[in-house]
Amino acid sequence: MQVILLDKVANLGSLGDQVNVKAGYARNFLVPQGKAVPATKKNVEFFEVRRAELEAKLAEILTAAEARATKINELGSVTIASKSGDEGKLFGSIGTRDIADAVTAAGVEVAKSEVRLPNGVLRTTGEHEVQFQVHSDVFAQLNVVVVAEA
């Protein structure tokens, strides 16, 4: 199925590219999320007219994402208190939602889907490095300090 991309999609292309994808991928993911439209004659003509407008909109979104990433990097670290045992192991774990809530409370709006935990959830006290993917091209980094709750 031929589609026109309205946004940058990993391993596929960027704004304006006409790509061939499987029908299910287009119908169930790309089109509902507003990342693509079917490549009909009408849509191709419509896209060519609006191309500059869409590129400006994407540039604005990218600038906003870079500003948020800078704010996250400037935070330096966020502290989260959790119940733990004697050896520093937590009762339970700290996941993406807990980290997103802590960063949002610190003053930078972050969604849980933007938090990247490559080694899984945090299960020990101490300092952990956490990545944030604010945009497909923009990443930020933050130290999360997990302390034992009194």
Curated annotation (Swiss-Prot):
Recorded GO MF terms: rRNA binding; structural constituent of ribosome
GO biological process: translation
InterPro entries found in the cross-reference section: Ribosomal_bL9, Ribosomal_bL9/RNase_H1_N, Ribosomal_bL9_bac/chp, Ribosomal_bL9_C, Ribosomal_bL9_C_sf, Ribosomal_bL9_N, Ribosomal_bL9_N_sf
Function: Binds to the 23S rRNA.
Primary gene name: rplI
Similarity section: Belongs to the bacterial ribosomal protein bL9 family.
Entry annotated with the keyword S-adenosyl-L-methionine: no
Keywords, in A-Z order: Ribonucleoprotein, Ribosomal protein, RNA-binding, rRNA-binding
Record's protein name: Large ribosomal subunit protein bL9
Keyword Disulfide bond (UniProt): no
Gene Ontology cellular component terms for the protein in this record: ribonucleoprotein complex; ribosome
Pfam (any one): Ribosomal_L9_N
